[in-house]
Amino acid sequence: MERVIDCFLPYIDAEQTLRTVEALLAEKEIANVCLLATKANAEPIEGCSMLVVEDFTSTATVKAIAAHAQSEFTLVYSKHEMLLFGYKALQRMVIVARDIDAGMVYADHYTYADGELQKSPVIDYQEGSLRDDFDFGSVILYNTEKLKEATSRMTANYKAAGNYDLRLKLSQKYAIEHIPEYLYTDVVCDTRASGERIYDYCDPKNNASQKEMEEACTEHLKVVGAYLEPIDFEDVDFDSEKFDVECTVVIPVLNRVRVIRDAIKSVLSQEAPFKYNLIIVDNHSTDGTTEAIDEFAADERLVHIIPDRNDLGIGGCWNLAINDPRCGKFAIGLDSDDVYATPHTLEKMVAQFYKENAAMVCGTYVVTDVNLKEMAPGVIDHHEWTPDNGRNNLFHVNGVGGPRAFYTPIYRATNIPNTNYGEDYAMGLAITRNYRMGRVYEVMTCARRWDDNTDANLDIFKENANNLYKDRIRTWELKARINKNKNSNKQ
């Protein structure tokens, strides 16, 4: 098994790239090394060819790589730092790719970060793995013949979404396979906490690239049969059931004694032209949270529920609250460490249901510290959402926004997963399959960041578990929408 791989890697300068080139040329599977340079006068490196490109992310660059690749396999390395393969690792990747006739394979790896060698596992690719920031690692091995065929179907000319479009095209016909073995070592580039990276798709400076990602994802949904037309919505009958109150705020809580009082006060101080209440599902707190909630017991609007079971996650607590007979026509969420940003949050959220005939409404929030001082990334308004294509674009982004509110009868017909992550996103996907989601672009909630946030800085294993689960949710919803379209076509 010799000389079966053409390798392509970004070229910044000779000194930075030379060690990686030497390591690659020492591997007997490597036939050719091609440097992707953005300058025509870049200094050559002995033993390498050079391909001048405008960038490393465009359709033009992807197609140029495919056109220049001649060996059985094409390897693309996406970082500028040193790359070192494990013993017989390239042979392993080639064998797996051949054995299963994959279009693309990728692997777990080690990463140097802060002077230490750390494990960097990645996750399996699924049909619903449609996030544009899916982490394949920095090394991807393509079957060259399949790479060329996939690029022949790339008709759009993207500046930022070239690689994203390529893997969507590959996935339509070929296997994208994860090798759960540590096969190489690279250097970490993005050292931000997971709680910071999740907002990248909401950053206004990424609007142009995110629009490209949306276009690529939408085209993919059309190809696989999961695209939903903007006119295909069911109407919501807001008089289908009678409720004692118009609106209920739901707060699931576990051990948040330092912040729960602020959350309760922000709810009970709401000014609304209708009757509302607050249901707190206290999931067996042991730090004084229960007693803190009881300080407000004199207010008849407060319903304090302690479950008689011990197997509820955040989703299960939501289900318990909304299926309680005291729940109102609309249920609006509030995290136990957050507060409403305005005394008119409930009024504006409820009004949006009627305005858009929506089964679910999402607001806008601002990220603050515990003292309500705004901090990066600031206001998260999800302006990537559009009434026409929002429910399709929801597959490629990683959240629906907040605060989240639901029309209770439709919620009760589905309920959300009994998990501590992704449960709201799952409901957003499920509801928008058939109904409209409304949006409020004024700040409704202050999402407070403090030292006890559960999602501020996850380790790689927890982050992977969360992403794997969310991709599973997307996969199920993708199949549900394909079935919906098939059944509609039969009628």
Walk through the language-model features, giving the residues of each.
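A conserved hydrophobic helix/loop-capping motif in glycosyltransferases and polysaccharide synthases
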Residues: 5-16, 27, 38, 247-259, ...
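Glycine-rich, basic loop-to-helix element that forms the pyrophosphate-binding segment
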Residues: 55-69, 308-326
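Short, acidic, metal-binding catalytic loop of nucleotide-sugar glycosyltransferases
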Residues: 22-31, 265-275
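A conserved acidic beta->alpha catalytic loop
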Residues: 37-44, 82, 282-291, 310
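Short beta-strand-to-loop acidic/aromatic patch adjacent to the donor-nucleotide binding site
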Residues: 71-84, 328-339
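A recurrent flexible, glycine/aromatic-enriched loop bordering the glycosyltransferase active site
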Residues: 118-142, 384-405
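Conserved donor NDP-sugar-binding/catalytic core segment of glycosyltransferases
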Residues: 82, 87-119, 344-377
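Acidic donor-binding loop at a coil-to-helix junction in glycosyltransferase catalytic cores
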Residues: 157-166, 420-427
